[in-house]
Regions:
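Core catalytic alpha/beta fold that binds nucleotide/phospho-ligands
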Residues: 1-250
Length: 250
């Protein structure tokens, strides 16, 4: 599914299987202290990432966490990984074609009570109220969270600093697109200041997916479908509240 919201320049793989996935020794060392469920997620999403890299002609390589726990991709490649219960995905592209990638997957259910007030700007909360009246079948607050996660995965490799949830104002198009405007000075890509991003979203099979591909030529972003077209401590949703976690890069 994830490939439907990313351009043809991007190799994207997703899966719902629970097959055992092997890790390189250096990867096992990097995740050795984690609980079994976390180690399984770490391995499975890297299986998808290596499959996607294979579509670019790149043989299997270790994908270890680097600065800010972000995965270190092979030279000449940009990428992004994500997982949620029952789903995992990875997207990669040549850095000569795409400058940065951000994808996120969430279970299609509303955010826990109080979380929207923590992540949403007043303008965003007003937008969600309007969208909910028109299309109540979509958990718009969770979609907003996912959009902001994809935005962050674009931001961090370019800026190398944290981006708080109020650092970007998101506007969601019910037709399947979204845009994000940085509320402070944006990062630099290909010698140009990036002030806003555009992406796509998909709601299907109990999942919410978001994706952004920041193009090298047509900055600020590539948002067409294929058929027409310092470390962050992530605020992760856990047990009904936001908790700080360093596992947001997958």
């Amino acid at each position: 599914m994830i490939e439907e919201i990313l351009p043809a320049e991007v190799a994207a793989i997703d899966a719902v299987d629970e097959d055992v996935a092997d890790l390189f020794a250096v990867e096992r060392a990097a995740i050795g202290g984690a609980v079994p469920e976390r180690r399984r997620e770490f391995a499975m999403v890297r299986k998808s990432a290596r499959t996607a890299l294979g579509q670019l002609g790149i043989p299997p390589v270790p994908l270890v966490p680097g600065a800010g726990r972000a995965p270190v991709w092979p030279t000449g490649v940009v990428g992004s990984m994500t997982h949620c219960p029952g789903y995992r995905a990875a997207a990669v592209a040549r850095s000569s074609r795409v400058h940065a990638l951000g994808i996120d997957a969430e279970v299609s259910e509303p955010l826990p009570s109080g979380v929207l007030q923590m992540i949403g700007l007043p303008s965003e909360r007003a937008m969600l109220a309007r969208l909910d009246e028109q299309h109540p079948e979509v958990p718009w607050d969770r979609l907003l969270f996912s959009c902001k996660e994809s935005v962050y995965k674009i931001w961090y490799p370019l800026a190398g600093t944290m981006l708080e949830f109020d650092g970007a104002e998101v506007e969601i198009d019910p037709g399947g697109g979204f845009s994000a405007r940085f509320t402070a000075e944006g990062p630099v890509a290909a010698g140009r200041r990036v002030s806003h991003l555009s992406g796509r979203w998909l709601h299907r099979d109990g999942l919410l997916l978001t994706g952004i591909a920041l193009g090298m030529i047509n900055l600020p972003g590539i948002s067409l479908r294929r058929d027409d077209h310092s470390p962050r401590l992530q605020l992760a949703i856990s047990s009904g509240e936001l908790t700080r976690s360093s596992l947001g890069w997958n």
